[in-house]
Amino acid sequence: MDRRGDAKSREMMLDELLGYDHVTIQCHDNPDADAIASGYGLYCFFRDKGKDTRLLYSGRNKVRKANLMLMVEKLHIPLEYQPQMEDTVDGLLITVDCQYGAGNVTELPAEEIAVIDHHPLEVICTERMRLQPNMGSCATLVWTMLQEMHYPVEKNRDLGTALYYGLYMDTNQFSELSNPVDMDMRESLNFDKNQISLFRNSNISLRELEIAGVAMLRCNYNDDYQFAVIHSQPCDPNVLGLISDFLLQVAGVNTCVVYKDRKSVV
């Protein structure tokens, strides 16, 4: 047993997935910083092993959140948006920060599947799974797996910056950091402080600020049950999360629902 809390002999290792010439890494729909960072870590590993590697996400919405677009651009992350895929994925499909068949990820047609995630088990879809829900971020899990392969993460500053930012965002700016492995990764990464500051200070665009402000001004509040309902203009789904996070910091609001219309569907 080690800090990760599981016997190493029962953990899927990355070298078990090297038998495929083609590897597709899929983040969950509406990917956040942790999903993108985790996918990028796996992308770098398989690319450097000579594999034909793709990093993509699917779903109804393309990434439009300012900090995530900057993250992808500044760290040169080759993230593709694949809204539809009719052909079966060639080679191996790895879902990262999500589980194949779960509700937050589009199910791409694939015959060979692996799962790497830091959330509790949702779907049993393959024997090739690495789930460690005791970790604060999936970036930490991917970093751990790269360390097991003696992969030189420290030589890739873009990757180090991505992993650092993934952990930062998924642990609420490190305020929910408790696992020693998360702390080990944070202390060991070679990252660009200026880029982290840029991402941190670009969490919302001026247009998104306007959408959030108008939505909160029109908040419907029930004093008896202390809940709020907010209808937002069309926006990135992550902005709905920002609005709800802010609203839950208001005294007297214990529960909230924030939603937007999507054509004829809410």
Where are these regions (language model features)?
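A structured phosphate/pyrophosphate-recognition subdomain
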Residues: 2-30, 40-47, 123-263
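Anionic-ligand anchoring segments at beta-strand to alpha-helix junctions in alpha/beta enzyme folds, i.e.
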Residues: 20-86
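Residues at the starts of beta-strands that form the adenosine-phosphate
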Residues: 22, 52-54, 92, 111-112, ...
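Active-site environment of divalent metal-dependent phosphoester hydrolases
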Residues: 62-63, 116, 237
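Short, basic, glycine/proline-bearing loop/turn elements
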Residues: 67-71, 87-89, 225-233
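Active-site cofactor/cluster-binding pocket
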Residues: 73-128
